[in-house]
Amino acid sequence: MPHHIMSINDSNHVQIGGRKSKLAVVQSEIVKKVIEDTFPNLSCSILALSTLGDKVQTQPLYTFGGKSLWTKELEILLLDSVDEFPKLDLIVHSLKDMPTNLPEEFELGCIFQREDPRDAIVMKQGSSYKSLKDLPAGAIVGTSSIRRSSQLIKNYPHLRFESVRGNIQTRLNKLDQPNNEYCCLILASAGLIRLGLGHRITSYLDDMYYAVGQGALGIEIRKGDDNIKSILKKIEDPIATICCLAERSLMRYLEGGCSVPLGVHSDYNESKQELTLKGIIVSPDGTVSIEDEVIKRITCDEDCEQVGIELGDKLKAKGAKEILDKIDMTRNINARPTEV
């Protein structure tokens, strides 16, 4: 049902910001449409901007160590306009790229529309292979994620896993080149589906733990902006919020960013009001893995936060922190200054 609100900043206009990639623009457009459909008296416009994570395409993500590769430039515009760029009212993120600890001036306004969170296998066009187990020994699988590669090395030791960067279409173009060494790619199914590329999905990795927040959109706002909050309250996804708050609490507790090998699986039973959160940490070489789960009845956001903390304690007790500390040491050794 449409809603009407008081004007925002003396106008009925909402300025949305997002990254410049095709997927990011599609996601911003999804939010724009839902806001305008829900609030007919509002109009929205979108500013698409390149970020550090977009500009540096030659290094594996885990070597950066930064937790705000995809957010920092946009956050500046949440505070004020800069040159020809307008002040933003909200930023649309892929939630999995959004830091769990935001600068004190900002907050997570809402969690919106979780698409299928699973990872997917995309085979080279014309390939007869359907699954990773069918691939010959030494076949090269492309993935941008240490979380994916560490789990897959553990389960498919006969394969080689190589980093591949770039937006989804760039990666697919690389894959389909006849002389390219990659047999397939591992990608988030949500991005493929949102871009209308669901037909490229060969199969789903049902047993693989996905990234924290994968498939969901996170909307970042200025802290205390009650007008924008009142809009977002009407469009949030309640079940995705429960699951993703718990997932993000776990990552925060383990002090991880989007470049650590933490995988999760969450499921909320509405009739029981019960959340099941599973988590896994795998060493980059796939030789050591630690997993556990927590099941808890949810009555408020604080319960979601507690689920993440409880699971974090269980994983730490089994040695998760040691794996993460070793990754930090490797990252610090490999880090190099990068021009952007």
Swiss-Prot record:
Enzyme Commission number: 2.5.1.61
SUPFAM superfamilies the UniProt entry points to: Periplasmic binding protein-like II, Porphobilinogen deaminase (hydroxymethylbilane synthase), C-terminal domain
CDD domains: PBP2_HuPBGD_like
GO biological process: heme biosynthetic process; protoporphyrinogen IX biosynthetic process
Alphabetic keyword roster: Heme biosynthesis, Porphyrin biosynthesis, Transferase
Miscellaneous information on this protein: The porphobilinogen subunits are added to the dipyrromethan group.
Protein name as annotated: Porphobilinogen deaminase
Originating organism: Candida albicans (strain SC5314 / ATCC MYA-2876) (Yeast)
Encoding gene, per UniProt annotation: HEM3
